[in-house]
Amino acid sequence: MLSLVMKILRKPKIEDIVCNIQNNEEDKEAFIVQYQPFIRKSISSVCRRYITEQDDEYSIGLFAFNEAIEQYSYKKGKSFLAFADLLIKRDVIDYIRKESKHNLVFLKEDEQEEMLEMQVSLTEYMKEIENGNRKEEILHFQSVLADFKITFSELAKESPKHRDTREHLIEIVKVIIKEEEMMEELFRKKKLPLKHIEPRVRVSRKTLERHRKYIIAMCIIFANNYTYILDYIRGGKHDE
């Protein structure tokens, strides 16, 4: 009886609310209004100034928060706000970078020289901001990995060292992420759906089990579209 009462009185989790309002524009709009202070705080951490509703960056942040609501699912980790914060900062950084390049094109020659000097400072500033955002992306990845009882040290130790092996495993990952049923089982049970994977790939169960942690990690990375981590992977770092 007590457990039933507690269940009724328990405040719904943000993540449950988000999943319930994804197809309801009125509820979604009310939710966005409720979290405007959070949106402003995320934008301000990038711009390092107070953000008003008249700022272009504010519109970018609102749109990114709306995208976070629409995209959020079990694949994005336990915290909706951590996921939304990533999207807001990423989009605001992209906007600032594009605007600085765009403004330079339409300036006179003497103004361009002055602008170029400003851009040197802006470039350093953007590097600093991106380093912070990269760190947050890695921390988000680490928290989702922890749900699967996988640590960074384990992943580093068990990741394949040879490029051809990694490429072959990525093909397996692509098979998994295209199948919603497999992804749902992966994130719900926190283990590879081997029974569904085996008939679709030309590798043994033993191979799948040996590279289990790497395959799971790649599924998490692609499902969350981690910008910086994906750039690192596509850059082919540490090939042998």
From Swiss-Prot:
Induction: Part of the sigI-rsgI operon, which is induced by heat shock. Expressed from both the sigma I and sigma A promoters. Transcription from the sigma A promoter is likely more significant to virulence regulation. Coiled coil: none annotated. It is found in: Cytoplasm. Its main location: cytoplasm. Keywords: Cytoplasm, DNA-binding, Sigma factor, Stress response, Transcription, Transcription regulation. GO terms for biological process: DNA-templated transcription initiation. A motif (Polymerase core binding) lies at residues 56-69. Disruption phenotype: Disruption results in increased sensitivity to heat shock. Loss of SigI results in a coordinated decrease in expression of all three toxin subunits. Negatively regulated by the anti-sigma-I factor RsgI. It comes from the Bacteria. HAMAP family: Sigma70_SigI. Interacts with RsgI. Belongs to the sigma-70 factor family. SigI subfamily. Sigma factors are initiation factors that promote the attachment of RNA polymerase to specific initiation sites and are then released. This sigma factor contributes to both stress response and virulence gene expression. This is RNA polymerase sigma factor SigI. It comes from Bacillus anthracis. The lineage of its organism: Bacteria, Bacillati, Bacillota, Bacilli, Bacillales. The gene is sigI.
